[in-house]
A protein has these predicted regions:
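Extracellular/periplasmic, surface-exposed regions of secreted and cell-surface proteins
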Residues: 136, 184-186, 300-303, 338-339, ...
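Conserved C-terminal beta-signal and adjacent last beta-strands/turns
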Residues: 30, 308, 756-758, 852-875
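Short, small/polar-rich motifs associated with maturation and membrane association
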Residues: 1-343, 348-349, 354-357, 363, ...
Length: 875
């Protein structure tokens, strides 16, 4: 019995060993070493090609000779991938597999959005930078333009510490002397010009195309002098599935560096050493040690949440999203929150001959700001000059106020007792129709309506320390404003290829636009019983400020009509030509110059398509571009820019000679002179560039040179009131030039089966210069501006606008140290410009140039690291 069992056990063990041996033999037989060489269609070996067993992490990379070796089972599939070539899959059925890879034209065939249409990258003749959604900056941003920071050569974005502050944006240098919209690029969202960026959440953006030279921007005519930024939003999918996505970001903002200010003990030591008596300015028996920067500044916590849904099929697509952002400023009392909603629906009808779409965008923004601008009323100003020896609050809980100095406003008092809030409501509706008439011929109609409502609410409490307000026992101001924008655009596109070599594109269109702006009213009331109701019930105030009625909101209607066209021609994808023209008419300008014409022309030569380049191994892509165009600037000008206007100038009292009763009446006075010859600012730009690609397009780039000149600058010039009813005239005088060079490099230094490193570097140099400021009619030597709004320097401008210098030229006194009394002294110059000593009372002749606000060089370096399903971006 025992023997039998042992035998059975032995037999079972032998069986197991046999099966294991059999499986091992089978595996050893099935495992196969595959070798081969990977080449392009010309037979050149490709180094760095990824070879991966499908569905596994088993892989290798080809060597410098294009050779590879990999252990893989028969019947499995190998995947060959390489930048600039299409992916190739090969089934393993032998031990030697050579692969020929085909070039991928996807990069060159990438669709680029241009004005009133799109084209492939290889057909572009002008300077256009495209940034896809995956390449945009991520984080908590209040302005979608900030997503481009460091991504586009020549695009400069200056942010503020206030979350409600508008970022200052310029492209290829300053081209206007006006402020605000007149200095910034023009925005086009989903083909609709002039849309507010506040209506678009960053997560809804699919791509952004930046038109940088005039040959690209001239199609937008009088609004494109500072470049055009075209935003394309995400639409629905056609896969028949409904997709729901969520994304969220959390950020903390901090002041990078605070000023090194004296603390209480250091200030006392300095005062004792220099015989300065500080006793009138603090309680000598109970001195404080207040760090006012720590009291005013904070870490600003921000968070952003976005949820979206999209789906559809081949006939109908839809999408919707909801975004919420809440951002704290680094200055206490400053914050911003916004909720944005967006919906989109598109469908095909009439047997797919008619595309219809409708979208609705809406946003509600709440802003709270502190006083950070007015000299003597600035929280930041007071933060620096307020005495560290005094406390934040008195013993009774009230805000400390040092009445022994001229500017006694406690910065924390201004944060909490002087409140400035704004509510913005925006709504936009867009309807589009595209009729496919015949193959290649489309008719388009775009209709847009945008409504903007603003409510400004200010309240200075009964504890406010501000001058002319603290005695009013609470003051409330409230004003409203509404802007309405209506647009209609219709245009026809025709694209056709003749004889496989001649590619022709034609576009012609018409647009109409009307802006009804500044429809509003405002009121100021004061002397409240308490601070509870603030501006919510101003009827409870004991006094109404008649002079405080908001008179700035004057309804204006501005209209513009335009005709435009474009022609594109390509011969054998080798020689490229584009020409555009636009004619705009605007009621903003003088009756003698309401129409302007803006043409452009550009050429390109794809050198790598020439026969003599077919056998070269250096360039994968080489294209030469040259172009010139003229665009204008009508942004920031209202319906009354060229009109004679009058406004309230005061009051006069009329006494009835019969009854003796008196009445007060408003007096009117001229506030602007009429200029029937006022016309567009015109910017002409010459651009030449080279696009290149090496190493199977693992290294690509662009180098460009431009010369941009803006003439007929619009500015206010002094005139004689003996001839005109008002002392200044808005006129076309002066010229600004911008010359620069830009370089962009895109590279993939590392690409393995699991890890990829993509890097992009852009560098730009721009030289800005004011060529002239005067003509035979209007003349000015220079203009001083740039008031620092710092206590003690209320009338001291630090910048000067003058010929031969850039816009933003600093023109200041040269600090030379301290005198024996501890006061600042400055270099003293004679009338010939010779340094003759120092002075504690410098005059205007002692000012000297000290750099410029215009950056000499801007650059951005972006890196993206991907490991399997993880990604890291660094900027």
């Amino acid at each position: 019995m025992l023997n039998v069992q042992l035998k059975r056990k032995r037999t079972f063990a032998q069986s197991v060993l046999f099966v294991v041996f059999l499986l091992s033999s089978t595996l050893a037989f099935a495992q196969n070493k595959v070798t081969g060489t990977v080449t392009d269609k010309s037979g050149e070996p490709l180094a760095g090609v990824n070879v991966l067993e499908k569905g596994t992490t088993n892989g290798c990379i080809t060597d410098l000779d294009g050779k590879y070796s990999i252990e893989v089972k028969r019947g499995q599939t190998l995947i060959f991938t390489f930048i600039g070539f299409t992916k190739k899959e090969v089934q393993v059925n032998q031990s030697a597999i050579n692969v020929v890879m085909e070039e991928d034209s996807q990069t060159l065939d990438e669709v680029v959005v241009v004005g009133y249409g799109s084209m492939t990258r290889k057909d572009v003749t002008s300077s256009i930078t495209t940034v896809k959604a995956d390449d945009l900056n991520v984080g908590v941003y209040t302005n979608p333009a900030q997503l481009l920071q460091g991504k586009v050569p020549g695009l400069t974005i200056a942010n503020t510490s206030d979350p409600n502050g508008s970022a200052s944006i310029s492209l290829r240098g300053t081209s206007s002397l006006r402020e605000g919209a007149a200095m910034e690029p023009y925005y086009v969202i989903d083909g609709v010009p002039g849309v507010s960026l506040s209506l678009i959440a960053p997560e809804d953006i699919e791509s952004i195309d930046v038109l940088r030279d005039a040959s690209a921007t001239a199609i937008y005519g009088s609004k494109a002098a500072n470049g055009v930024i075209i935003v394309t939003t995400k639409k629905g999918s056609k896969n028949g599935k409904t997709n729901v996505n969520y994304s969220g970001y959390v950020a903390i903002d901090n002041t990078l560096k605070t000023l090194d200010m004296m603390n209480a003990s250091e200030l006392l030591a300095y005062a004792n050493a220099n015989n300065v008596d500080l006793s009138p300015y603090y309680d000598v028996n109970n001195p404080a040690d207040t760090n006012w920067q720590d009291e005013v500044l904070r870490s600003g916590f921000s968070h952003n949440h976005n949820i979206s849904i999209n789906g559809g099929n081949e006939k109908t697509t839809y999408s919707a999203s909801l975004n919420y952002i809440d951002r704290e400023g680094v200055v206490r009392g400053t914050s911003m929150d916004r909720i944005t909603a967006r919906s989109f629906l598109q469908t095909k009808t009439l047997k797919d001959h008619l595309d219809l779409s409708v979208s609705v965008n809406a946003s509600i923004t709440n802003k709270q700001t502190a006083s950070t601008e007015n000299q003597g009323r600035s929280v930041l100003d007071a933060m620096y000059y307020y005495n560290p020896l005094v406390p934040v609050k008195n013993a009774d809980g009230s805000w400390y106020a040092n009445t022994s100095i001229s500017q006694s406003y406690n910065p924390l008092s201004m944060v909490y007792e002087d409140q400035y809030k704004t509510k913005e409501k925006m709504l936009q509706g867009i309807a589009k129709a595209t009729l496919h008439i015949i193959d290649g011929l489309d008719w388009n109609l775009n209709l847009s309506y945008q409504n903007e409502q603003y409510i400004y609410s200010n309240y200075n409490t009964t504890q406010s320390q501000l001058p002319n307000i603290s005695s009013r026992h609470g003051q409330a101001s409230r004003s409203t404003k509404e802007n309405i924008k209506k647009q209609m655009e219709t245009y026809v596109n025709y694209d056709h290829v003749f004889a496989d070599k001649h590619k022709l594109g034609l576009m012609a269109g018409y647009s109409w636009e009307q802006n009804d702006d500044n429809d509003g009213f405002g009121l100021t009331a004061y002397n409240f019983y308490d601070d509870y109701l603030k501006y919510y019930n101003m009827g409870l105030a004991n006094n109404m400020d008649i002079d405080g009625i908001n008179s700035d909101n004057k309804l204006s209607t501005l209209r513009m009509i335009s005709f435009y066209g474009r022609v594109n021609y390509s011969f054998n994808s080798k020689y490229l030509f584009q020409a555009t023209i636009r004619r705009d008419g605007s009621s903003a300008f003088g009756k003698n110059n309401r129409w302007g014409t803006f043409p452009s022309v550009s050429l390109a030569w794809r050198i790598t398509e020439e026969n003599f380049m077919k056998n070269q191994k250096v360039f994968d892509d080489l294209k030469f571009r040259i172009g010139y165009g003229v665009s204008g600037n009508s942004l920031g000008f209202d319906a009354y820019t060229a009109q004679q206007t009058y406004g309230a100038s005061g009051w006069f009292t009329y006494v009835d000679p019969v009854t003796g009763s008196s009445s007060s009446y408003r007096t009117l006075a001229a506030t602007k002179n009429a200029n029937p010859d006022l016309k567009w600012e015109r910017t002409g730009m010459f651009n030449v560039g080279i696009d290149f690609g090496f190493f199977n397009n693992r290294l690509t780039g662009t180098i460009e040179y431009y010369d941009k000149r803006t003439k007929d600058l619009i500015y206010d010039y002094p005139v004689s009131t003996n001839r005109y009813p008002y002392g200044t005239m808005t006129a076309n005088v002066g010229e600004i030039s911008n010359k620069g060079i830009e370089l962009t490099i895109n590279a993939t230094p590392v690409m393995t089966n699991n890890f990829t490193w993509n890097t992009t570097l852009n560098i730009a140099h721009n030289k800005n210069n004011v060529e002239s400021l005067s003509n035979d009619t209007y003349s000015v030597n220079y203009r001083d501006y740039g008031n620092p709004d710092v206590g003690g320097y209320a009338t001291t401008n630090v910048q000067r606008l003058m010929e031969g210098s850039p816009v933003g030229q600093f023109y200041v006194w040269e600090w030379a140290g301290y005198n024996e009394d501890g006061g600042s002294i400055f270099n003293d110059y004679d009338t010939e410009g010779n340094l003759i000593g120092t002075t504690d009372a410098p005059d205007d002749g002692d000012r000297r140039k000290a750099g410029s606000a215009q950056p000499k060089v801007t650059f951005g370096w972006n890196n993206a690291f991907t490991y399997k399903n993880w990604s890291l971006t660094a900027f």
